[in-house]
């Protein structure tokens, strides 16, 4: 059977990335508390294409991805190595996004409910292997300015803290979620009874945070974590009294700690 993809291309233009995207794939996430959580991931993967080749064999991505069952750094490097070999490429890239549910206990009534967190993994290999993981955690922020100038209350809203890290040692998704929640005005909860709602509202009022505050505090926490070699923090609040959102971002290398 004729191999069209393997035909020589006369244009002689190399392509940096060729691949598949938005592939839905079942996989398991290892839990910090032992066990696994099943989820459905959205996958994009690619390789570079030599200037003399017309195309790649897309089906080979799926064949290689068949070994992806549980998320670990080791399996990602294996997949990239296999893609480079089978596609006769120099570079391979893999990106995965998936929902992950943490079980939260409400602060007063102690009732449990799941909270969805968006997780992602990005891996690339050329000469060296690069591996990033991250979370996008929903939190609660209350405006310090609104509290300061108002006689009654303060505007508050849901916000998202996106943390992306490179590490020298394994780090749990749950650890990143905890860092995001502890540096906001308050965590979010799916289930709150009236005593819980009172507690969360008052806690946020006593702990006002701009997006700038959250970004800086999260960055300082990551800066001091010996496991982390690089990070990026992006905070966005769904402003409740404005017809726009507010955001702040910072990454390692943007500043130097003094003292």
Swiss-Prot record:
Pathway: Cofactor biosynthesis; 7,8-dihydroneopterin triphosphate biosynthesis; 7,8-dihydroneopterin triphosphate from GTP: step 1/1. The keyword DNA-binding does not apply. It is an enzyme of class 3 (hydrolase). It comes from the Bacteria. It catalyses: GTP + H2O = 7,8-dihydroneopterin 3'-triphosphate + formate + H(+). One of its GO terms (biological process) is tetrahydrofolate biosynthetic process. Its EC number is 3.5.4.16. Keywords: Hydrolase. InterPro entries: GTP_cyclohydrolase_FolE2 (IPR022838), GTP_cyclohydrolase_FolE2/MptA (IPR003801). GO terms for molecular function: GTP cyclohydrolase I activity. The record marks 143 as: May be catalytically important. Signal peptide: none annotated. Converts GTP to 7,8-dihydroneopterin triphosphate. HAMAP family: GTP_cyclohydrol_B. Belongs to the GTP cyclohydrolase IV family. PANTHER family: GTP CYCLOHYDROLASE MPTA. This is GTP cyclohydrolase FolE2. It comes from Thermotoga petrophila (strain ATCC BAA-488 / DSM 13995 / JCM 10881 / RKU-1). The lineage of its organism: Bacteria, Thermotogati, Thermotogota, Thermotogae, Thermotogales.
């Amino acid at each position: 059977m004729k191999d069209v993809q393997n035909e020589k291309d006369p244009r002689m233009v190399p392509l940096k990335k060729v691949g598949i995207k938005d592939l839905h794939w079942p996989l398991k996430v290892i839990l910090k508390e032992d066990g696994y959580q099943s989820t459905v991931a959205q996958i994009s993967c690619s390789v570079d294409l030599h200037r003399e080749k017309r195309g790649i064999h897309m089906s080979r991505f799926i064949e290689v991805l068949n070994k992806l069952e549980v998320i670990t750094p080791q399996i990602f490097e294996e997949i990239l190595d296999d893609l480079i070999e089978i596609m006769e490429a120099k570079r391979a890239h893999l990106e995965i996004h998936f929902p992950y549910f943490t079980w939260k206990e409400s602060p007063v009534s102690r009732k449990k409910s799941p909270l969805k967190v968006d997780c992602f993994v990005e891996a690339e290999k050329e000469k060296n292997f690069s591996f990033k993981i991250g979370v996008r955690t929903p939190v609660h922020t209350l405006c310090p300015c609104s509290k300061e100038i108002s006689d009654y209350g303060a505007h508050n809203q849901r916000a998202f803290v996106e943390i992306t890290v490179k590490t020298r040692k394994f780090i749990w998704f749950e650890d990143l979620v905890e860092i995001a929640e502890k540096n906001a005005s308050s965590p979010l909860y799916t289930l709150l009874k009236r005593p819980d709602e009172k507690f969360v509202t008052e806690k946020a009022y006593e702990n006002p945070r701009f997006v700038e505050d959250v970004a800086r505090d999260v960055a300082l926490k990551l800066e001091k974590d010996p496991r982390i070699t690089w990070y990026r923090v992006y905070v966005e609040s769904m402003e409740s009294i404005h017809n726009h959102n507010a955001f702040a971002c910072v990454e390692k290398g943007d500043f130097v700690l003094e003292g």
